[in-house]
A protein has these predicted regions:
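Serine-dependent protease modules
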Residues: 1-210
Length: 210
């Protein structure tokens, strides 16, 4: 098993920041026409595979749900600037962002809060392609309470942040805002902030476990 620093160094090239933009409509009042406005949110993702043309990135469904525009920042990219550029851009077809790459949703599983997004390899600068890598996948079946873990994600939209803690409990069940229950969850005391959604929880071998 490695140190937190070693796990972070090995795993950060597999973690991305995701910016999403959705268009919402404000209803009209007093006879005025309705208005549309853009709202941006940030999350994280993990590079889990590829094919000849694309990188495949796993994230949470709630990170990308309802998004009309998606962009992905890799290690070393300016996440804050990319968010501003993405909001100011048009739809995905018009997206031309210096510090990020356009992405599209490949599939979603709302019940398990999972989604996969894809990025064209041809859109990624060569020096970035040489840095990033596919995450090592571990098994959550082998976890134990008290085991040390590392969390990496786009905390608060500032870019990649690393925190560490311990597995506090396994197989937790929580109720979500829509009244459904999520089961089999890992509880950790590693700091998790808004923007971490979709990011990596790793064991001390650097393997993805959640």
């Amino acid at each position: 098993n490695g140190t937190v620093a070693a796990v972070a160094q090995a795993s950060m090239p597999s973690v991305v920041a995701i910016t999403t933009v959705s268009v919402q409509e404000i209803p009209s009042f007093f006879g005025y026409s309705s208005r549309q406005y853009k709202s941006a949110s940030t999350g994280s993702g993990i590079i889990v595979g590829d094919n000849d043309d694309e990188l495949l990135i796993a994230t949470n469904n709630h990170v990308v749900d309802g998004a009309t525009t998606l962009s992905v920042c890799f290690i070393g990219d300016d996440v804050a600037n990319a968010e501003t550029e993405t909001v100011n851009a048009g739809d995905n077809g018009d997206l031309n962002v210096e510090d990020a790459v356009s992405a599209k949703i490949k599939g979603t599983d709302a019940d398990n809060d999972l989604a996969v997004v894809a990025v064209k390899k041809s859109d990624i600068p060569e020096d970035t392609l040489n840095q990033i890598k596919i995450a090592q996948i571990g098994s959550s079946d082998d976890l134990a309470v008290g085991q040390q873990v590392v969390a990496i994600g786009n905390a608060l939209g500032y870019g990649q942040s690393v925190t560490s803690g311990w597995i506090s409990a396994l197989n937790r069940t929580i109720s979500t805002d829509d009244g459904t229950n999520s089961t089999g969850l890992i509880q950790t005391d590693a700091a998790i902030n808004p923007g971490n959604s979709g990011g990596a929880l790793l064991n001390m071998k650097g393997e993805l476990i959640g």
